[in-house]
Amino acid sequence: MAVKIRLTRMGSKKKPFYRINVADSRAPRDGRFIETVGTYNPLVTENQVTLKEDRILEWLGNGAQPSDTVRNILSKAGIMQKFHEAKYSKK
């Protein structure tokens, strides 16, 4: 099962709000998911983001692939840097 970390659109028309979910890559965008690991609100001036850092690092360690947008969000939060340091410091 290929697992992705991606955005699920919530909110109403013209007022999007996103949940950052871990889901099977074959599931529809707003369909079945495994776990919610954060939220993203692009309408707030500072792009409000909440993340469960420990769960995201665990999923990345288990092989989950983030989408391009989620990868950018995680990079700005510093989570991708922590993941790469943990992954390559073992060797």
From Swiss-Prot:
One of the GO BP terms on file: translation
InterPro entries: Ribosomal_bS16, Ribosomal_bS16_dom_sf
Name of a matching Pfam family: Ribosomal_S16
GO molecular function: structural constituent of ribosome
Entry GO terms, CC: cytoplasm; small ribosomal subunit
Keyword annotations of the record: Ribonucleoprotein, Ribosomal protein
UniProt key word Lipoprotein: no
Disulphide connectivity of cysteines: none
Gene3D superfamilies, sorted: 3.30.1320.10
Record-stated family: Belongs to the bacterial ribosomal protein bS16 family.
Alphabetized NCBIfam families for the sequence: S16 (TIGR00002)
Listed name of the protein: Small ribosomal subunit protein bS16
